[in-house]
Amino acid sequence: MADKFYRPTYLKVDLEAILKNYQVLGKLQPNKTVMPVIKANAYGMGSVNVGHYLKKHGAEFFAVATLDEAIELRMHGIDTKILILGVVMPKDINKAIQHRVALTVPSYAWLNEAIKYLDEDLEKDLWLHVKIDTGMGRLGVKSAEDYQKTVALIQSHEHLIFEGVFTHFAQADEDSPHTKEQYEIFENWVDTIPHPSYVHAQNSAGTILFDAPICNMVRTGISLYGYYPSEYVEEQTNAELYPSAEWITEIVDIKYLNIGDTVSYGSTYTAEKSEKIAILPVGYADGFPRMMQGTNVEVNGQQCTIIGRVCMDQMMIALPENEDINVGDKVTLLNREHSGPQSLLSHAKQQQTINYEVLCRIGRRVPRIYEPEKVFDIVNELQK
């Protein structure tokens, strides 16, 4: 891991806040295992550092999306249980066994094909979680009969372990009857045969708002990092979450515009008066998109507007008159508030998307600085 970076743009990640959220979510669903979802580089926070910190504080089972993500965790010393939520190609099943990870069974056909690739001299077990499609329209078996047939095939093989069964809610973050309907289907099908070790259905929204008595594990993603899955969820709960990310940059240059001067590509901004502007070393290649033109960043407590188009690596802001703002002053792009102009919610609205996507867009060339001080670390992906 690198201990330096050479551009003053970075994402501060508060691991203690993530731990608090892990504990809050666990208290909402007592007697259930909390499975932290650390796919997509832990929603941009850094899966290795997040994984190690949560493991140190009791997490025993992580979820990722791909075999590559699971291998990354193993290569960095995370030896907990890991479930891959996405599809692993049948031909790669022995690689999954080698790294001791659990796989999702998306269909009977997948399982039947995967078995063909098992090494003949296999000595290690493979843990499997059967996915049931109760209304997401994505992965999963589509009937109780298919579920029973799939489990029977697993149990007919000496080294395949039926460890879990799960589904995924499509509208748990909305005021919709669909979640209850999905849960009832899931419960009915799961109850047709003896339960495996893990039964899980609740995502972040389901964990916060929905009781699922048949389940003994919850999968927490966005809320693990301190963000509500939707405004509806935030309105419906008293659970306090702690935002964990703060995106900071610095002013690298200041210049003065005359009346009529233009700024950035397309000359979309024209100075109507003499004004002072600052250049920031961050752009859409870092995950700060062009559509953020006209929104605000914070400098020394002042709201400053982004003028002209956001460039690949830089952007410009207008500075208020008579304010003592200089090269080297810190600029907040994203703060740890739940609302306000630099909140993740505000970013999502401005970008016409969801908070998940905003976090996942923050690029690999933005170093992550981990707090608190007792675990201080810097990860610069470009110097690994």
Swiss-Prot record:
Cofactor: pyridoxal 5'-phosphate
Annotated catalysed reactions: L-alanine = D-alanine
Binding residue positions for substrate: 138, 312
A single GO BP: peptidoglycan biosynthetic process
Pathway it works in: Amino-acid biosynthesis; D-alanine biosynthesis; D-alanine from L-alanine: step 1/1
Modified residues (N6-(pyridoxal phosphate)lysine): 39
Pfam families, sorted: Ala_racemase_C (PF00842), Ala_racemase_N (PF01168)
Enzyme Commission number: 5.1.1.1
Active site as annotated: 39, 265
GO MF term (any one): pyridoxal phosphate binding
Disulfide bonds, paired cysteine numbers: none
InterPro entries, A to Z: Ala_racemase, Ala_racemase/Decarboxylase_C, Ala_racemase_C, Ala_racemase_N, PLP-binding_barrel
Broad EC category: isomerase
Family in the record: Belongs to the alanine racemase family.
Protein's recorded name: Alanine racemase
Provenance organism: Staphylococcus carnosus (strain TM300)
Source organism phylogeny: Bacteria, Bacillati, Bacillota, Bacilli, Bacillales
